[in-house]
Amino acid sequence: MGGLLGDRLFFVIFLTYNAMELYFYEDCEYCQTVLKTITKLKISDEFTFKDIRINPVYAKELIDLTGNVTVPCLVNAQGPMKEAKDIRKYLVSQFV
């Protein structure tokens, strides 16, 4: 499968059957806020964690998805979500 439509279809199918993805890097203050929320809610198993500083492939994926490397970025079946406060609010609404 190729092209934009094929890639987006794969993306939706992948996220439907797999964990959410969190693009982050360790020393990002905003990322730490989201990571602490995930730990507090005990939902780490719901995620694939992608540290963009450890693996440059993840940074490229993030650029392909959003046009930049701003983290944290939560990716779920609805697409990418940025802003730590929005991500935290979403997680609490879904898992509390």
Give residue spans per PLM region:
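Thiol-based oxidoreductase modules, predominantly thioredoxin-like and allied folds used
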Residues: D45-Y58
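Short amphipathic alpha-helix with an adjacent loop that forms part of the alpha/beta core around
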Residues: A59-L65
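Non-catalytic, surface beta->alpha helical segment in thiol-disulfide oxidoreductase systems
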Residues: N76-V96
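Short alpha-helical
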Residues: E29-Y30, V57, K82
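Local sequence-structure signature of Cys/Sec-based thiol-disulfide redox active-site neighborhoods
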Residues: I13-S44
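Targeting/processing segments of secretory and organellar proteins
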Residues: G2-G3, D7-R8
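Structural micro-motif
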Residues: L65-C73, A84-K85
